[in-house]
């Protein structure tokens, strides 16, 4: 396993056999995301984007109680006490958010415990979300009196629909795992005992597939969500061409012809 060197120990990043691991490592605060951690997220995602050996990335929280419980509110009095400070805070945190949003390889969120506020915003950047039965997901911004940034709101509404998004935002309630599955907020519910194994098996399946095809598929779905049909088709045309010119496609045709 290859360890990626970051300027913080609150974000851990590793690569092993085509799979990247990003761990939120502040369990004493239920992995609340500090500004230092946002910097680490951006650094780690940039490294894993550039690493051709990385086919898929798994995000998880340390400690077994939370994926991430939102922003580290203990910093707010010093770093985010008013609108002016919010903009300064955003200038630093936005790099991590942007890398999560534009990461070209599949992202998997392994949710075990609380996934709240900014933690849910991180999970919404994942392409696939696994959760344990005891997990709780929600956005309690209305209880704290703070504004939730547009990208997170838009991602939530696209995923669960405007009606459910309004319910979650207005009530500030936390969804249990079975409701999160029903509304489409998570893809799979698996036991706490098996989640690491189940997520790893799923990631290995992705890593074994043709990377250009997987990349093009992710780009196509993302374009479908964000653009008009004409803009979406244009955005992925080059990626589709790259698939047809790849060695994976040639080998796939040979394997099919030879019935392998």
State what each model feature region is.
Residues 27, 51, 79, 103, ...:
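Generic structural signal for alpha-helix termini and adjacent loop/cap motifs
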Residues 1-60, 98:
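Conserved CoA-thioester-binding segment of acyl-CoA-metabolizing enzymes
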Residues 61-98, 145, 227-228:
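Glycine- (often His-adjacent) and acidic-residue-rich active-site loop
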Residues 22, 26, 40-41, 59, ...:
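Terminal peptide-recognition signature
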Residues 37-40, 89-92, 195, 236:
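Hydrophobic alpha-helical membrane-association signature
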Residues 98-211, 246, 251, 258:
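Crotonase-fold acyl-CoA enzyme core
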Residues 1-17, 52, 64, 172-178, ...:
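C-terminal alpha-helix plus adjacent terminal tail
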């Amino acid at each position: 396993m290859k360890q990626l060197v970051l300027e913080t120990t609150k974000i851990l990043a590793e690569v092993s056999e085509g799979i990247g691991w990003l761990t939120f490592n502040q369990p004493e605060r239920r992995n609340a995301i500090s500004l230092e951690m946002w910097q680490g997220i951006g650094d780690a995602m940039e490294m894993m984007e550039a690493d051709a050996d990385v086919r898929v990335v798994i995000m998880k929280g340390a400690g077994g109680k939370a994926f991430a419980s939102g922003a580290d509110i203990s910093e707010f009095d010093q770093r985010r006490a008013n609108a002016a400070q919010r903009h300064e805070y955003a200038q630093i945190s936005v790099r991590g958010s942007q890398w999560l949003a534009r990461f070209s390889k599949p992202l998997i969120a392994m949710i075990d415990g609380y996934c709240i506020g900014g933690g849910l915003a991180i999970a919404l950047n994942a392409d696939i979300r696994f959760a344990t039965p005891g997990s709780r997901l929600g956005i309690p911004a209305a209880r704290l009196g703070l504004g939730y940034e547009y990208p997170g709101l838009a991602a939530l509404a696209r995923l669960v629909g405007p009606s459910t998004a309004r319910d979650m935002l207005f009530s500030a309630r936390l969804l249990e795992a079975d409701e999160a599955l029903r509304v489409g907020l998570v893809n799979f519910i698996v036991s706490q005992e098996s989640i690491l194994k189940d997520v790893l098996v799923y990631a290995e399946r992705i890593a074994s597939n043709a990377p250009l095809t997987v990349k093009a598929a992710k780009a196509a779905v993302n374009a479908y969500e964000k653009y008009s049909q004409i803009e979406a088709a244009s955005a992925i045309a080059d990626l589709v061409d790259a698939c047809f010119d790849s060695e994976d496609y040639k080998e796939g045709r040979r394997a099919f012809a030879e019935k392998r």
